[in-house]
Amino acid sequence: MVREDPSVNPWLIRIAVDRATGVIVGQVNFHAPPDDKGMVEIGYRVNPAHRGQGYATEIAHTMWSYAARHPDVRVLRANVRPDNEPSRRIIEGAGFVKVDEEIDPEDGLEYVYELTAAGYRARFPT
């Protein structure tokens, strides 16, 4: 994808590294660049040894902040399994609203959350 269109690179996978130790703690990405409606969907994962230390919150907010300030983005989306309470707390705490449910072929039932880019910027101005 990047070879054909290098402009998609900022939307793809990034490695999350602890600033103090240099240890890889997880990864984050958007599933694709903004679609024709201006929507981007985040995906993130924190390695098990580093969970519960605030990394997921920082990772998600770093990417949401980037996307919410991009001129082509109007809607931020996050899908999460109902039993993933830590991620649901992060998403709901950021102001996302559950708008749907869908079945993912790999993960099963997922809740679909959305927040407008303008709504994110209003809640987290910087």
Task: Describe each PLM feature range.
Residues 1-41, 46-49, 62-70, 83, ...:
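GNAT-family acyltransferases
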Residues 48-58:
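Glycine-centered recognition micro-motifs in short, flexible terminal segments and loops
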Residues 57, 83-99:
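Conserved active-site alpha-helix within GNAT-family acetyltransferase domains
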Residues 76-80:
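Conserved hydrophobic beta-strand within the GNAT/NAT acetyltransferase core sheet
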